[in-house]
C-alpha cells in the first residue's frame, strides 16, 4: 500500500474520535461535565413542586416547552414560552 493510501486510512480511523470527542457518555459510561451542566442548568431543585420541571432564577415556568433566557435589561434569567 502506498504512503498516501496509508495516511488516508489512518485519517479515516481518527475522524470518529474527533467528531464525538466531547458529547454524551464517556468510555466509562459517565456523562461529560459540559453536557451535564447544560442539562441541569435550568432544572428545578429537588423537592420543588414544579410540574414543568423548568425553573428560571428560582421561578417555576408554566409549561415544559418554555426555556430560560437572560433579560438584557435586568440581567435575570426569565421563562420564555
From Swiss-Prot:
Transmembrane segments: none annotated. Keywords: Disulfide bond, Neurotoxin, Secreted, Signal, Toxin. The keyword Disulfide bond applies. Its main location: secreted. It comes from the Eukaryota. Expressed by the venom duct. Residues 22-31 form a propeptide. One of its GO terms (cellular component) is extracellular region. The keyword Disulfide bond applies. The cysteine framework is C-C-CC-CC-C-C-C-C. This is Conotoxin Im016. It comes from Conus imperialis (Imperial cone).
Amino acid at each position: 500500500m502506498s504512503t498516501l493510501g496509508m495516511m488516508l486510512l489512518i485519517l479515516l480511523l481518527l475522524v470518529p474520535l474527533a467528531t464525538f470527542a466531547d458529547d454524551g457518555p464517556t468510555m466509562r459510561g459517565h456523562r461529560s461535565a459540559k453536557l451535564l451542566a447544560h442539562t441541569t442548568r435550568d432544572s428545578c431543585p429537588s423537592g420543588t413542586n414544579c410540574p414543568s420541571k423548568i425553573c428560571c432564577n428560582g421561578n417555576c415556568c408554566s409549561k415544559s416547552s418554555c426555556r430560560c433566557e437572560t433579560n438584557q435589561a435586568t440581567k435575570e434569567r426569565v421563562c420564555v414560552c
